[in-house]
């Protein structure tokens, strides 16, 4: 989403007191409450990579580009990740799935979610073939579907249809844990924003990742 985002008014800086800098150029946000959830924003340059840990489970949202694959794998290993319960490709641009392909080979992956469209790149084909080689079926969740995760859950907010614009195909999720909530947008742009508004779902959140 664009920085002048009108969809959500709450901004990340309101929660700077929750942030703890950790090695490997990552930022960790710990959700408050009785049940802890740690959200690691991993610095992969232009792309996106977010690790969420809760209740012994792990969720990886995007993996940056291919040049950051070793960093992603190393960081996950440092966090004692052995199984990725949910791997989510927001969309299939290189700077979002490049680091996911080797993660499929290096970790036990239970579920892979992505938007239901075909990208023309060789990397997309490699991503799909690697999933198939590891006996994983890529799933395409619908808007409004909710999945239990750790001590919380996440709900799919977008895409509500497929666009010619790859960014607007981003699989957007809202992650909730107790009174804390996060929205991960991939590269969703204005068309996707308007679609999310039209659904009438609750789009308030504590932390918005854009």
PLM feature spans:
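Non-globular, low-confidence helical/coil segments that flank catalytic cores
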Residues: 2-7, 17-210
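Acidic, serine/threonine-rich, charge-biased low-complexity segments
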Residues: 11-14
């Amino acid at each position: 989403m664009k920085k002048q985002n009108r969809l959500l008014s709450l901004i990340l800086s309101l929660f700077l007191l929750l942030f703890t800098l950790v090695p490997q150029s990552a930022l960790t946000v710990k959700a408050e409450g009785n049940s802890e959830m740690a959200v690691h924003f991993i610095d992969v340059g232009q792309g996106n990579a977010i690790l969420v840990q809760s209740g012994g489970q792990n969720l990886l949202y995007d993996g940056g580009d291919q040049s950051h694959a070793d960093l992603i794998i190393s960081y996950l290993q440092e966090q004692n990740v052995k199984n990725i319960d949910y791997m989510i490709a927001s969309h299939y641009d290189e700077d979002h799935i490049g680091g996911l392909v080797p993660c499929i080979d290096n970790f036990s992956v239970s579920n892979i979610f992505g938007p239901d469209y075909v990208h023309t790149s060789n990397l997309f084909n490699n991503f799909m073939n690697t999933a198939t080689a590891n006996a994983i079926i890529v799933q395409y969740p619908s808007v409004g579907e909710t999945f239990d995760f750790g001590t919380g859950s996440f709900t799919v907010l977008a895409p509500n249809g497929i666009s010619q614009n790859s960014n607007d195909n981003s699989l957007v999720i809202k992650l909730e844990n107790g009174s804390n909530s996060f929205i991960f947008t991939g590269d969703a742009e204005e068309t996707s924003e308007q679609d999310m508004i039209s659904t009438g779902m609750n789009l308030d959140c504590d932390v918005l990742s854009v």
